[in-house]
Amino acid sequence: MEFNEKLQELRKQKGLTQEELAKELFVSRTAISKWESGRGYPNIESLKLIAKFFSVTVDELLSSNEALTLAEESQKETEKHYHNLVF
């Protein structure tokens, strides 16, 4: 099961609308909609907040491919940050 499907399932299990979940996570309803439709992914901080809110781990939220992609993107951002500090 992919992240978008898991998020929607968890939200519905709690009986929340996208708007209600958005308020709990301090994001827009549009962000929730994009995440649930697979048109976008939350950043790592939002993923941590989602996991905490639903009492699951980040690993449980992501498929192995999604976790790998997220790790690679995080590494690129870190490298970019260090590059900017050095130069």
What are these regions (language model features)?
Residues 55-77:
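Short C-terminal boundary/hinge segments that cap the last helix of small helical domains
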Residues 12, 23, 34, 52:
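Alpha-helical residues within the helix-turn-helix
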Residues 42, 46-54, 60-62:
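Hydrophobic micro-packing sites on short alpha-helices
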Residues 73-87:
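Hydrophobic alpha-helical bundles in membrane proteins
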Residues 5-20:
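Short basic helix-loop element that most often maps to the first helix and adjoining turn
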Residues 25-41, 63:
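Recognition helix of helix-turn-helix/homeodomain-like DNA-binding domains
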